[in-house]
Every structure is written in structure tokens, then in C-alpha cells.
Amino acid sequence: MIRRGLLSVTAALVLLSVSCSAQETMGCADRTAINDFNATLYMGKWYEYAKMGSMPYEEGGVCVTAEYSMSSNNITVVNSMKDNTTHEVNTTTGWAEFASELHTDGKLSVHFPNSPSVGNYWILSTDYDNYSIVWSCVKRPDSAASTEISWILLRSRNSSNMTLERVEDELKNLQLDLNKYTKTEQSAKYCAGAEHVVGAMLSVAIASLFALLH
């Protein structure tokens, strides 16, 4: 199961994901976002279960969540994470919009006030009620390399084994390497002080990633 799989990631991979800004590859993989995306069903709160790639400022961050709500012309994004050392909760608010005019696929563009860059947010798989697998990749302007990041989002901090098994199957179907994901702390011990805050630094990671690359 994914719970055991993520916990079995080697120490070297864990250290690598913390010290590197994100997963580097030679060119972005040819991936496809879902083509029948229902934005209304996707709204609400999501908990970051695990991520592939990491931003430097995320070190020590726990209880990562993201909350989405529909507004008049876009999607409001409220993100937060709790600093495991200072116990402070950091939040930010941005917005997302469809990357295409059809508004039928899971390709979104994410914007934040303090970032001049736009991050891509591709939903590769979701059942809306339990899980979502999100992916982002951008080619570096100064080389042939690209930077890839991905998140596993769940609707609750403690999801069932059935949901986790479904996620693992979807990762295999998407040809995403389970061992490159590191689990995000979401236990009640660490997250009790963050329950009153809506959101996580999920989309901030995208915005900061693009800021570093431009």
C-alpha cells in the first residue's frame, strides 16, 4: 500500500527532496490532464498527503492544506502550512484560472500577488471526494533541463486504506514513481494548532518555482 511505500523511501531520497528545489528531468514528460474536469466538485479543502519535489522554504513545514472556492471570474486559492519549529501558520491567498478557453480539462494557471510568474497546475487524476493527483513541470530557460513537482491531495487527514490503494494504482497508471514522493506530516499531534486555518503552501510552491526559473 502507499502508506508503507512512502514510508520506505530511502534516507537519501528524503534528503534530496529537502535540499533540492524540485525534481529535475531532461524535458517535461508527455502527460495529460483529465479532460472532463468539474471545477464545482473540486472546490473545498484538500490535505497534502505527499509530494514529489520540494521548495527550500518548505523544510519543517507540516499540516499542508489548500482550499479552493469559486469566485465571479476565477478560483480563489487559500493556502497554509504550519512551521514545525516555530509552530506558526503561514498562509497566502491567490487565484487560479483555466489554462484553456474550453474550461473542460484539468489544466489550471495559478497566480499569487507577490510572484510575477504563473504556475501550471495540472490535475492528472481525481475522484473529487477522496483524492487528487496534481502535477507541474516547466522547462528551464537556460538549459534543456526541466523541473517537475507533484502532489497527492486527500480530502481528509486520515484517509482509508482503500483510498490510498486507489492512489497507488493511479500513480502506476500515470507512470509516476511512488518512491519519489515524501509523506507530509498531517497527524493530530502536529496539526491541532492549524485546524482553524483554511488552506497550504501547495500553490505557493508552484509560484515560487516559476519565480526561481525566470
Curated annotation (Swiss-Prot):
Entries under SUPFAM superfamilies matching the protein: Lipocalins
Tissue: Expressed by a subset of neuroblasts, ganglion mother cells and neurons of the CNS; by all sensory neurons of the PNS.
Compartments in which it is found: Cell membrane
Signal peptide: 1-21
A GO cellular component annotation in the UniProt record: side of membrane
Keywords noted in UniProt: Cell membrane, Developmental protein, Differentiation, Disulfide bond, Glycoprotein, GPI-anchor, Lipoprotein, Membrane, Neurogenesis, Receptor, Signal
Entry's Gene Ontology molecular function annotations: pigment binding
PTM annotation: N-glycosylated.
A biological process from GO: cell differentiation
UniProt cross-references to InterPro entries, sorted A to Z: Calycin (IPR012674), Invtbrt_color (IPR003057), Lipocalin_ApoD (IPR022271), Lipocln_cytosolic_FA-bd_dom (IPR000566)
Propeptide residues per the UniProt entry: 193-214
Main location class: membrane
Glycosylation sites (chain numbering): N38, N74, N84, N90, N130, N158, N161
Matches recorded under CDD domains: lipocalin_apoD-like (cd19437)
Membrane topology value: Lipid-anchor; GPI-anchor
The keyword Zinc appears for this protein: no
Lipidation (GPI-anchor amidated alanine): A192
Other facts noted in the record for this chain: Named after the main character of a 16th century Spanish novel, Lazarillo de Tormes, a crafty boy who guided a blind man.
Role noted for this protein: Putative role in axonal outgrowth and guidance, required for the navigation of identified commissural neurons. Could be a receptor the midline morphogen.
Assigned protein family: Belongs to the calycin superfamily. Lipocalin family.
Protein name: Lazarillo protein
Originating species: Schistocerca americana (American grasshopper)
